[in-house]
């Protein structure tokens, strides 16, 4: 069973997936990590990004300058759409490979930690969807801390994605992450029981 884990940025998807990684027979695929892999130095995806936006998004060492690219796209919806149109096909191809590998290893459940699950089309790879949500003020604080952003930078990142209702309307399961880690672990355990894992 493939389950997409999604929700607005800063909601705690990765924290939920960190808890899931401890389950026996479960595989977690980090789609952000997959995105990093497909944009590594020398990849076709990285070349496509540089051609579309500017060679300046490639650092002197040949790697993607994520901060520079983020500054270009997160405040401009049209540019973000163009970036996604380039990167999503590469990500989907890699996800199919990783899902097949996890199935070969005998995983009972495969969770895709995917911030852009629907936008990328990766939801088509999933049998169920888990949405993680959190209050906007908590998300803002987490994003500022996690990404070392100013309040405006974090707000721009939040504004570049759909709101929680977008994700909830498509969810089979929901976890609300507004409390401490113990409460989150309990919510994940309840999900484990519902899934029969």
PLM features: residue spans?
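Hydrophobic anchor at the beta1->P-loop junction of P-loop NTPases
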Residues: 5
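The conserved Walker
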Residues: 9
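Walker A/P-loop
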Residues: 14
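Short beta-strand-centered segment that lines the nucleotide-binding/catalytic pocket of NTP-utilizing
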Residues: 26-39
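ATP-dependent small-molecule kinase phosphotransfer cores
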Residues: 36-105
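Small-molecule kinase domains that catalyze NTP-dependent phosphoryl transfer to phosphate-bearing small molecules
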Residues: 95, 124-125, 145, 149-197
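ATP-dependent NMP and nucleoside kinases share a basic, alpha-helical "lid"
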Residues: 96-104, 108-145
């Amino acid at each position: 069973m493939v389950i997409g884990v999604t929700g607005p940025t800063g909601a705690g998807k990765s924290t939920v997936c960190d808890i899931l990684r401890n389950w026996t027979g479960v595989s977690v695929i980090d789609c952000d990590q997959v995105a990093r892999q497909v944009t590594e130095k020398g990849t076709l995806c990285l070349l496509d990004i540089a051609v579309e936006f500017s060679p300046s998004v490639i650092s002197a060492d040949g790697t993607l300058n994520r901060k520079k690219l983020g500054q270009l796209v997160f405040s401009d919806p049209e540019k973000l759409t163009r970036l996604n149109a380039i990167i999503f096909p590469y990500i989907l191809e890699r996800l199919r490979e990783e899902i097949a590998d996890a199935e070969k290893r005998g995983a009972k459940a495969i969770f895709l930690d995917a911030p852009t699950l629907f936008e990328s089309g990766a939801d088509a790879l999933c049998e169920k969807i888990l949405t993680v949500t959190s209050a906007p003020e908590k998300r803002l604080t987490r994003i500022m801390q996690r990404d070392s952003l100013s309040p405006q930078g974090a707000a721009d990142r939040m504004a570049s994605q759909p709101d929680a209702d977008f994700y909830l309307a498509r969810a089979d399961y929901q976890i609300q992450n507004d409390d401490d880690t113990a409460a989150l672990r309990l919510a994940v355990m309840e999900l484990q029981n519902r899934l029969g894992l």
